[in-house]
């Protein structure tokens, strides 16, 4: 031990070491607090914000895809499967059928029926349209008009509601805002990649990764703090030990030279510690600046996504049920047919109306065709042709075959009496001319028209001419329609 170093000097070194150690411990405590704050901000707070953003983003994507499918399904169900289907049926089925009905009724109205064709005598001619149920047709038309008017009102109501309640809100708020939110979320993706790189050994850290740089620097600074604190603690322990040895007069040797050198270096060590502390505090400020630069954008993304999810929840709980209830009610109204027929529930009212109209068209078309091509010809045959033929046959028979047979029979009987009559007693019934069958009167039915005379005969001839002229016109019309 050097004689120049007394107990007072060593004691002063010990006090200096204690004071320096206490200052160092305070600085290290503050530095550790700063390190923990920086670490929390960079490895906990910021990642938690990003994780919250990730969770919200995944939920947002799921809800958006779900509501997009529901919105499209509602659009197809309401517009394509119900409204457009009924509208197409109306334009391609019902309207052509009504046009055909108008056409055939027009033909019936244009087809004159001479008064002599009617059982009851009438002064004026009528048309075929006078013999169809126009009241029933008009009632059917009114029912169709009522249905189509209601269909148009419901179509406008459903279309407007679908647009206002589902399509427009989802497009403006759901889709447009969703796309903007996605862009905002994509802006924080580079930060996520930087944080992911810190916990991944897949690729070396980028020198531009501020978070990684700060954490790496702070880890080195923390090690330096520990090293300095250990050195100061060790120096203090040695000084304390030296004081104890000097005061106790023990024989244990103390390297006072080392203590002296260490004591002289304490201000520099403390200065170095302050420098490390300042760097740590500065890193905390840098970290806070980094957080302040990025947290607002992350929080904006989170707030935007929460707002978007709130819209989606409201959309699911209010808008969708509203349109579905309206759709169900309107569909029941549109599919309820005023016509009770065996068409079955699978047929729409428009299809049932169309079937009914087509049946009328078929019946009236047959009515017109039969009248033009069958009835007039058959009527002429039964009223004129056949009676004449029958009368001709009857006249020929009476005046030819039957008359000849009567003459032959009369001559035969006369010859027989001449030859055999004298041999038969007069008390016997003798054959002769007195009981020969003869026609004294011919009674016929259905030949009155062809047997008329005078004015009646002239009128009958006129009717036949009119009938033949009408038949000719009908046949010409049939040929024109064929060609």
UniProtKB/Swiss-Prot annotation:
Residues forming coiled coils: 136-161, 206-235, 446-483
A Pfam family recorded for this sequence: ATG17_like
Domain of life: Eukaryota
Keywords in alphabetical order: Autophagy, Coiled coil, Cytoplasm, Membrane
GO MF term set: molecular adaptor activity; protein kinase activator activity
Intracellular or extracellular location(s): Cytoplasm; Preautophagosomal structure membrane
GO CC field: Atg1/ULK1 kinase complex; phagophore assembly site membrane
Listed InterPro entries: Atg17, ATG17-like_dom
A Gene Ontology BP annotation from the UniProt entry: autophagosome assembly
Functional note: Autophagy-specific protein that functions in response to autophagy-inducing signals as a scaffold to recruit other ATG proteins to organize pre-autophagosomal structure (PAS) formation. Modulates the timing and magnitude of the autophagy response, such as the size of the sequestering vesicles. Plays particularly a role in pexophagy and nucleophagy.
Annotated family: Belongs to the ATG17 family.
Protein name: Autophagy-related protein 17
Species, as recorded: Scheffersomyces stipitis (strain ATCC 58785 / CBS 6054 / NBRC 10063 / NRRL Y-11545)
